[in-house]
């Protein structure tokens, strides 16, 4: 396990303890171990090093004492800042964006997510090439290497730009396929689990699968970004069939490259009928909701049903504090490891879904037996009758099926 020193850059209103914990958790998720931390309140960014020169001395002395070779910052550094810091410290420097991209690369399991991570890495790398090649040229001796270095730089830049175009085209092709797949499940109620990292989304999905489904579990661990790829499972809630999608968690301070890496998740959210916003009730409720609300506003989720799920209530010292949190949406308080709580969540979901159902009477000709089979399989039929031409059924249908089969309604 690689030992590192973490550097936390604080704004005047930041909570130092939370910032330290978040970066330490990310380092742990990446497979490293934070052996010390250095913090500095920065009101004006040093364009050369981001932090002050005095802090650099402190970091250098600490690294020498602990024999640490890697420093990790919790901010995104410019190409010149990365270069200057490594030159000054003679140590490897990793910034916030590079750290998270590394975690994403470790945890990407589908073709789409791997392509997205590669694209984000290339877009992150492109503006930094100049400084990297300058550094390599100096290591090689400087004089006599400038021409070849510049040629190599231009060749590498063109190669990266070519790879970016190729990846963007491949991702567009994947999106076309996904659009077709979404259409194939238009008549199933689609629900997405969204929330902060490590809030318990995968635990909820796994619990729901155990109680109401039969497919494999989703990887779940006490790590930030344990889920990178979106994972969709089908569930049967008492003849109400739904898909439930687990997504990578939200987090603050994401660069454009990292936001692009979230597109898989964000696109699934857009095509959902309902969002389950999962909140870790034991940790900074206001901060989580602020991050989630901001992200949902940015992706324009439209008019969707939303249930706020306050999870980990078993870890809350004062349960009344969470229950007093007022939202304009439905809310429920659970511990995702308790089956009874998950059944209560299922009941709440079904209640909200049913509010969108309409009771109808349909006449289905005998020649359209497949349509009748569909409703018999997927709905509770309230009443059945027959005439000389077909079957008459009464039932409650969802909005999608109401629109699709409106011609059968009498």
Describe these PLM feature segments.
Residues 139-256, 269:
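Conserved G1/Walker A P-loop phosphate-binding module
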Residues 6-10, 37-40, 72-74, 276-280, ...:
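Conserved beta-strand segments of the P-loop GTPase G domain that flank and frequently precede/overlap
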Residues 92-98, 102-106, 112-141, 302-307, ...:
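Canonical P-loop GTPase G-domain recognition
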């Amino acid at each position: 396990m690689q030992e590192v020193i973490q550097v936390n850059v604080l704004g005047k209103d930041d909570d130092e303890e939370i910032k330290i914990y978040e970066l330490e958790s990310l380092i742990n998720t990446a497979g490293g171990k934070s052996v010390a931390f250095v913090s500095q309140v920065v009101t004006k960014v040093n364009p050369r090093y981001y932090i002050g020169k005095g802090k650099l001395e402190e970091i250098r002395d600490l690294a020498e004492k602990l024999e640490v070779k890697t420093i990790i910052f919790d901010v995104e550094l410019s190409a010149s800042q990365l270069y200057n810091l490594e030159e000054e410290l003679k140590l490897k420097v990793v910034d916030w964006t590079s750290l998270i991209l590394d975690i994403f690369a470790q945890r990407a399991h589908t073709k789409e997510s791997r392509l997205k991570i590669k694209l984000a890495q290339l877009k992150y790398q492109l503006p930094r090439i100049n400084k990297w090649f300058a550094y390599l040229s100096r290591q090689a001796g400087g004089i006599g290497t400038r021409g070849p270095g510049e040629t190599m730089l231009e060749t590498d830049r063109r190669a990266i730009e070519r790879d970016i175009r190729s990846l963007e085209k491949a991702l567009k092709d994947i999106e076309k396929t996904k659009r077709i797949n979404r259409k194939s499940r238009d008549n199933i109620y689609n629900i997405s689990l969204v929330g902060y990292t490590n809030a318990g989304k995968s635990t909820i999905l796994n619990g729901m699968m155990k109680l109401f489904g039969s497919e494999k579990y989703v990887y779940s661990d006490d790590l930030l970004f344990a889920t990178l790829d979106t994972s969709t499972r089908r569930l049967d809630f008492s003849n109400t069939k739904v898909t439930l999608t687990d997504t990578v968690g939200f987090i603050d301070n994401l660069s454009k490259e990292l936001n692009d890496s979230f597109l898989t998740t964000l696109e699934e959210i857009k095509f959902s009928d309902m969002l389950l916003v999962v909140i870790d009730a034991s940790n900074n409720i206001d901060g989580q909701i602020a991050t989630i609300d901001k992200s949902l506003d940015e992706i324009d989720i439209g008019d969707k049903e939303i249930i706020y799920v306050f999870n980990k209530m078993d870890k809350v010292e004062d349960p009344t504090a969470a229950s007093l949190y007022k939202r304009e949406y439905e809310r429920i308080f659970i511990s995702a490891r308790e089956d009874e709580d998950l059944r209560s969540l299922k009941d709440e979901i079904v209640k909200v879904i049913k509010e969108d159902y309409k009771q109808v009477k349909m006449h289905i000709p005998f020649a359209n037996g497949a349509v009748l089979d569909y409703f018999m399989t997927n709905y509770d039929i309230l009443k059945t009758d027959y005439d000389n031409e077909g079957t008459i059924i009464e039932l409650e249908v969802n909005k999608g099926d109401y629109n699709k089969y409106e011609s059968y309604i009498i």
